[in-house]
């Protein structure tokens, strides 16, 4: 099965967590299961939320999916588990983590990044305040994450 990264169809592909269209490739995540089905996320934080969803378990019933994340600087697709993450980026859903191929001072590995997101070490509160001041969130009701 071909599990190489897919091209984003900006007119069609949407995040399965928040239902927003994929608008910024440099923060996108895609998961491809052994059947070749692809699901999209517009922010690594949305991906982390989905890990606890029953639909993720269904998606990977035939085996572990290959998961790609775009390098925040270049847009190159990286293996999500091998990438390094910096905190402080302005990301589509405000989690604040951008991926990089290279580890630099202050960057986190995948497991640490997931743990930080689950602990709420994100820019979500700042993001929500900004969106509220701009007239509200644009994602589906109840789908804007934690």
Predicted features and spans:
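Intrinsically disordered, low-complexity linkers and terminal regions
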Residues: 1-40, 44-146
């Amino acid at each position: 099965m071909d599990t190489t990264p897919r091209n984003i169809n900006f007119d069609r592909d949407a995040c399965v967590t928040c239902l927003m269209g994929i608008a910024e490739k440099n923060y996108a995540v895609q998961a491809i299961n052994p059947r070749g089905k692809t699901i999209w996320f517009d922010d690594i934080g949305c991906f982390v939320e989905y890990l606890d969803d029953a639909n993720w378990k269904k998606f990977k019933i035939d085996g572990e999916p290959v998961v790609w994340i775009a390098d925040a600087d270049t847009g190159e697709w990286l293996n999500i588990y091998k990438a390094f993450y910096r905190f402080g980026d302005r990301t589509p859903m405000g989690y604040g983590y951008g991926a990089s191929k290279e580890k630099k001072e202050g960057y986190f590995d995948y497991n640490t990044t997931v743990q930080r997101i689950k602990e709420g070490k994100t820019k979500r509160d700042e993001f929500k305040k900004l969106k509220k001041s701009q007239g509200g969130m644009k994602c589906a009701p109840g789908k804007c994450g934690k």
